[in-house]
C-alpha cells in the first residue's frame, strides 16, 4: 500500500573506489551514488528521491562500512528482494549488505557521531595490492609516528591538513594511531568530522616524521601553524578506506 508519506530506509554497503570519481553523483563520470541511484530508479521509481550518503568520499577512496539512506512511499517495501536485485544490478566493486526501514529522524550524514578511516601502507611490493594500498619501501620509525599521531588528539583546528578554506576547521579527533600487520602499516583515525584531503595529508606528514625529516616539535609547529603549505605531501587516494561510521544506539542498523 502506497501513501503520500515517505518512509526512510538505510543501506549498508562496501565499495572499491578505484574506478569511480568518488561518492557524489557527477555528470559524465561514474560515481558510487550514481550507480546506486540507477538501481533504485530501475527497481523502484524513476522519481525516487536522491540517496544520501554518510560522507563524500573522494575519487579512488574505498569504503568497508558505509551507510546511506533513501525515502520511499511504501513502508512494506520488500527489502530482501531489493537487496538481491540491486546486488545483481550493481558492478562487482559495489556490494549492498543490508537495507532496513529506519526512523524518520535518521540522516546518514548528520546523524553520524563519528567516522573512522584507515590508510594502508604496504612495505612490500605486491601486484595484488595495486589500487588497494600505497607501496612505500623506505624504513619508517613507527614509534615516532605514533608519538606524533597522539599529538593530534590535543589539537582541534585541522586547517594545516587541508587546502580547502573552511569557516569551521575544528575536528574532534578521538583516536589516531599506527599498527603493523604483516607487510602492512595501517594508520587508523576516528573523528566527528574530517576536512577535505585531511587524512591523506596527515599520513604524508607522519611519514615525514617516520623518515626523521621532521621531529616531534616540528610536527607540533605544523599543526599550530594552521597553514597547509607547512605540512607534508598527500599520499595517494587508493590507500584510504572509510572503515566505519558510528551512530547513536537508538538507531538499530
Please describe what each predicted stretch is:
Residues 1-253:
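Structured-RNA-binding interfaces characteristic of tRNA pseudouridine synthases
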Amino acid at each position: 500500500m502506497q501513501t503520500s508519506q515517505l518512509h526512510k530506509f538505510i543501506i549498508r554497503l562496501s565499495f572499491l573506489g578505484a574506478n569511480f570519481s568518488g561518492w557524489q553523483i557527477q555528470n559524465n563520470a561514474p560515481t558510487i551514488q550514481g550507480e546506486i541511484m540507477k538501481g533504485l530508479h530501475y527497481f523502484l521509481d524513476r522519481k525516487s528521491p536522491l540517496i544520501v550518503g554518510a560522507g563524500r568520499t573522494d575519487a579512488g577512496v574505498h569504503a568497508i562500512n558505509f551507510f546511506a539512506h533513501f525515502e520511499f512511499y511504501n513502508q512494506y517495501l520488500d527489502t530482501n528482494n531489493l537487496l538481491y536485485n540491486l546486488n545483481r544490478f550493481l558492478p562487482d566493486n559495489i556490494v549492498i549488505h543490508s537495507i532496513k526501514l529506519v526512523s524518520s529522524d535518521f540522516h546518514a550524514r548528520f546523524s553520524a557521531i563519528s567516522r573512522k578511516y584507515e590508510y594502508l601502507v604496504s612495505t612490500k611490493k605486491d601486484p595484488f595490492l595495486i589500487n588497494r594500498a600505497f607501496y612505500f619501501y623506505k624504513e619508517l620509525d613507527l614509534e615516532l609516528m605514533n608519538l606524533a599521531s597522539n599529538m593530534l588528539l590535543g589539537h582541534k583546528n585541522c586547517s594545516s591538513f587541508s587546502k580547502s578554506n573552511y569557516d569551521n576547521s575544528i575536528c574532534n579527533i578521538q583516536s589516531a594511531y599506527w599498527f603493523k600487520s604483516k607487510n602492512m602499516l595501517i594508520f587508523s583515525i576516528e573523528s566527528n568530522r574530517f576536512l577535505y584531503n585531511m587524512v591523506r595529508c596527515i599520513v604524508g606528514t607522519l611519514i615525514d616524521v617516520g623518515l626523521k625529516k621532521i621531529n616531534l616539535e616540528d610536527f607540533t609547529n605544523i599543526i599550530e601553524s594552521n597553514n597547509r603549505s607547512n605540512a607534508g605531501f598527500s599520499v595517494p587516494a587508493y590507500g584510504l578506506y572509510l572503515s566505519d561510521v558510528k551512530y547513536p544506539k537508538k538507531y538499530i542498523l
